[in-house]
Structures are given as C-alpha cells and as structure tokens.
Amino acid sequence: AASCPHEGINALNAIIQLFNGIDALRQHVTPDVRMHGVITQGGVAANIVPDEATAQFYFRAGTKETLDDILEKVKNIAKGAALMTGATLEMSRYELPNDNLKTHENLSSAFMENLKALGIEDIHGPKETGSSDIGNVSHKTATIHPYLSISNCPLTGHSVQMANATITDLAHERLLTGALALAFTGLDVLNKKIEL
C-alpha cells in the first residue's frame, strides 16, 4: 500500500461501496423490509491493499415477491460497487432462503378460541414478523405460528430480558397453556371441526 497502491485493487473498498449502496436503498423500501450485513473479511494488515474482502447479509421482507425485488436491487448495487473499484464480484447463498409465513386462518381462529377456553383473554390476531423456515412449511401445508406472552412487560426477541423471562413461573404457565391450546386445536382438526 505504501510503495505502489495504484497497482492494487482494494476489495475492501468494493465492500464498503456495497454497504453504502444498500444503506442508500433503505430509504426506498417498504417498512416490512430488513437488511442486515457484516464484513467477515476485510484484509490482513493496514499496510497491504486488501485483495479479498467478504460480507454476509440477511434480507427480509413481508412477501417473497418483495424480497425478490430487493435481492435484484442488491445484486445491481454489488455489480456497481465492483465496477466502481475494479474488483471481481462473487455472490453465493450461505443459507437457504425462508419464504414468508402464510397463516392458515381457520387454524388460527380455532387456536385463539382454545386459548380463550383456557382463560387467555388478551388475544391478538396473526402477527407475521421476522423470518423462519416455518414460512417454507406454510406454503406446503396449513400452518400457524402462535406467540404467547411470557412477561407482563414488552420483550424484544433474542435479548437477555427475553432469556430471563423464559425461566419464570409465568413463562412455564404460558408454555403449558400454549401446549394445551395446540393439542385442543389438533383435536379440532381430527374431529373435523376445522376446514383445512
């Protein structure tokens, strides 16, 4: 980097431009879109032009169609970043994608009725957030993905507060209630009380 930087192609610059482009894209996406990224390799020493740099990203959206549109835009941003810096671009998936969750309304309604029968009163309709492979399942068969509150305070998933809440008496009580509601919903299916 000191003697002839003009002869090097800085792969880290390409990654930085990719992040800048994705950051600019954020103002043009719908509220359901989430874009997360991290640089996993950016060079080996400050005095050496990085000849290789890598990053990993997660892209999420409310529907597969929106996600496909976002991914196409991101691919173009990556191509532009490589073109701007003279770098070579390689893209690959490091995990299988997750489809959006399609909640089966009849199953969801039956589950909510079973919760009410078990004494849970504060019930909200289907809430489809985050991403999980249960979305892929929901495109093949009737699916619900219920949540039950395990705290009297709002919690954020994947947090220390959430982890601590899982070992409380309320959490254990709600786990049992949820399991019973699922079992009763399964009985409703077996007894043909729900149209799938």
Predicted feature locations:
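Midchain, well-structured core segments that form catalytic/ion-binding scaffolds
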Residues: 1-109, 113-115, 126-135
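Short glycine/serine- and small hydrophobic-enriched flexible loop segments
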Residues: 17-24, 183-191
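Residue-level recognition of short, well-ordered coil/turn positions
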Residues: 30, 193-194
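Long, hydrophobic, amphipathic alpha-helical segments used as structural scaffolds
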Residues: 85, 190-193
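Acyltransferase
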Residues: 118-122
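Zn-dependent metallopeptidase/amidohydrolase metal-coordination segment
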Residues: 123-181, 185-189, 196
